[in-house]
């Protein structure tokens, strides 16, 4: 089964095809002759789930065989079913039912990735490394890979950007100490030293993503714009106020004169001020 044919199939049929092709070759293989998939994208296994699976196997047996390929005479590598293998191993069973397939490295890597993606059990770092592995092994573009695994090209590109982070940060994502969004925010920092330092601050202060982004903006010197009220030119405002004051005074003087009082009103304008003089006689 060439790699191109494998990637040309609908994901939901890939594992079924493997089982159908090998249904006549189910064998009971010794546990000590089987080793894990070298292309297994998942590096962290939930022990509680494996223990739960082991309890089911203890009662009902292994219902679905694992899939392996023969690497050397009587030595087999797991293609699919490592959780079942680990559960059986914990039960100290000597043999496990298996389907033997003849697949090359590219096909094995593709199956391992697709199987885990379908179950949504990979961490963002595991997923990113699996994409990189497939791209490195086969002359396939991100766009073609995206179509085959049912993801957008941008989703694959964004996942792979996480691999630019220092190993310490990647480990934190892998172990679920920080979220993928935390990790993405760290990509804005210029140096690995800054990224590792902020990782420590996240752990110490239990920052959420928004708090982390605010701290990163502070480091980068990005200041939040402050909204300011629009003000008219100061000179224009002062001129308007002076005119109002002058008109008010003149209107008052006019009212006094209209009431029969004889008074003198003079005004003088200088560079710095207006001078108003009002003379009111004490006697008529």
Curated annotation (Swiss-Prot):
GO terms of molecular function: DNA binding
UniProt record similarity statement: Belongs to the ParB family.
Keywords annotated in UniProt: Cell cycle, Cell division, Cytoplasm, DNA-binding, Septation
Subcellular compartments: Cytoplasm, Nucleoid
InterPro entries: Chromosome_partition/occlusion, HTH_ParB/Spo0J, Nucleoid_occlusion_protein, ParB/RepB/Spo0J, ParB/Sulfiredoxin_dom, ParB/Sulfiredoxin_sf
Signal peptide positions (record): none
One Gene Ontology cellular component annotation held by this UniProt entry: nucleoid
Any one biological process term the GO annotation gives: chromosome segregation
Gene3D superfamilies the record matches: 1.10.10.2830, 3.90.1530.30
SMART domains for the chain: ParB
Protein name: Nucleoid occlusion protein
Gene for this chain: noc
DNA-binding region per UniProt: 143-162
Source organism: Listeria monocytogenes serotype 4b (strain CLIP80459)
Function (record text): Effects nucleoid occlusion by binding relatively nonspecifically to DNA and preventing the assembly of the division machinery in the vicinity of the nucleoid, especially under conditions that disturb the cell cycle. It helps to coordinate cell division and chromosome segregation by preventing the formation of the Z ring through the nucleoid, which would cause chromosome breakage.
């Amino acid at each position: 089964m060439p790699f191109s044919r494998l990637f040309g199939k609908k994901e939901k049929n890939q594992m079924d095809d493997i089982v159908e092709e090998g249904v006549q070759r189910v064998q009971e293989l010794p546990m000590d002759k089987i080793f894990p998939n070298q292309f297994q994208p998942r590096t962290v296994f939930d022990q509680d789930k494996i223990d739960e699976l082991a309890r089911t196997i203890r009662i009902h047996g292994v219902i679905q065989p694992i899939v392996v390929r023969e690497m050397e005479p009587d030595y087999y590598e797991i293609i699919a079913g490592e959780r079942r293998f680990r559960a059986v191993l914990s039960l100290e069973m000597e043999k496990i039912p298996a389907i033997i397939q003849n697949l090359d490295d590219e096909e094995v890597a593709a199956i391992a990735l697709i199987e885990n993606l379908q179950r949504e059990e990979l961490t963002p770092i595991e997923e990113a490394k699996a994409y990189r592995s497939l791209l490195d092994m086969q002359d396939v573009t991100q766009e073609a890979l995206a179509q085959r695994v049912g993801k957008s090209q941008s989703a694959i590109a964004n996942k792979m950007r996480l691999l630019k982070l220092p190993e310490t940060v990647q480990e934190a994502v892998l172990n679920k100490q920080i979220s993928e969004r935390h990790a993405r925010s760290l990509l804005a920092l210029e140096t690995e030293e800054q990224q590792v330092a902020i990782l420590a601050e996240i752990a110490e202060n239990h920052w959420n993503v928004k708090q982390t982004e605010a701290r990163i903006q502070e480091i980068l010197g990005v200041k939040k714009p402050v909204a300011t009220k629009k003000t008219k030119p100061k000179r224009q405002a002062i001129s308007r106020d002076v005119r109002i004051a002058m008109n008010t005074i003149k209107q008052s003087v006019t009212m006094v004169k209209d009431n029969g009082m004889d008074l003198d009103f003079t005004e003088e304008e200088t560079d710095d001020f207006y001078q108003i003089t009002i003379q009111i006689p004490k006697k008529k």
